[in-house]
Amino acid sequence: MATLIQRSLSLAKSSTPALQFLRFRGKINIQRPKAPHYERARVVAVTQPKYPELPKAKSCFKTRAERTQQQQENPYNEIIAREVRNWLDHSRLVAFFHLSSITADDIFRVRVQLHKQNLHLKSYGSKIIEQAVKNTRYEAIVPLFHSNHCIVFSPDPEKTAALLRIVRRVPQMVLLGGIVEETMLSRNQLVAYAQMPGLHAVQAQLVQTLSQAPGHLIQQLQAHQNSFVQVLDVHAKNQMNEETPKST
């Protein structure tokens, strides 16, 4: 009885067959597909949309600029252009860089280092830059954005030296020029400006110079009187020396 139960249990066990999927026919020809059936081809031909053709006078004699002028600009570009204009108006230091081949990790590290110095690294498209500075005093910077670029903004112009020190470690960022205190500067002028002393140091030198001027003036006014007093003192001492032997 036990042997019969064991045999029945072995037969009752489920077995998973090995399946292997095979294509019934050869590979599908994607480049030169087989022509569809006549009925299907007729349905496809009937359901194809038909667009009205433009008159030849409009398509031939109308320039490409006139045809594309009717396209509506993306409103998001206007928002970004206003943001660029806001950065330009409220930044006392603006530096323009040409970006060579550089990885995203390197850009991120440079962005973090600049942010610690209150310097903000931004990148915009050339069309957005052109839309932002059109008919403004910043229109002269448009030729700088024909290739890959980035812009650094800062409200503090004294950060120019820190900016050049950070960018010196990244050869992929090439300085083109900048705007400092609403004045357009070239690369060499920007480097020379960074080497100038700070405003507080110059103010201290001016205060020191102004404080030295009154003392120098008083010294010059009293120079003749002091020299005359010294001459009289020497003359009095000589007379006293001459009178002393006579009295003895």
UniProtKB/Swiss-Prot annotation:
A GO biological process of this protein is: mitochondrial translation
Indicate whether Lyase appears among the record's keywords: no
GO cellular component term of the entry, any: mitochondrial large ribosomal subunit
* One Pfam family named in its UniProt record: Ribosomal_L10
* Organism superkingdom: Eukaryota
Q: Transit peptide range?
A: 1-24
Protein name as annotated: Large ribosomal subunit protein uL10m
Q: Which family does it belong to?
A: Belongs to the universal ribosomal protein uL10 family.
Q: CDD domains from the xrefs?
A: Ribosomal_L10
In alphabetical order, the GO MF annotations are:
structural constituent of ribosome
Checking InterPro entries in the record gives: Ribosomal_uL10, Ribosomal_uL10-like_sf, Ribosomal_uL10_bac_type
- What keywords appear on the UniProt entry? Mitochondrion, Ribonucleoprotein, Ribosomal protein, Transit peptide
| Ribosomal protein as UniProt keyword | yes
Location in or out of the cell: Mitochondrion
Q: How does it assemble?
A: Component of the mitochondrial ribosome large subunit (39S) which comprises a 16S rRNA and about 50 distinct proteins.
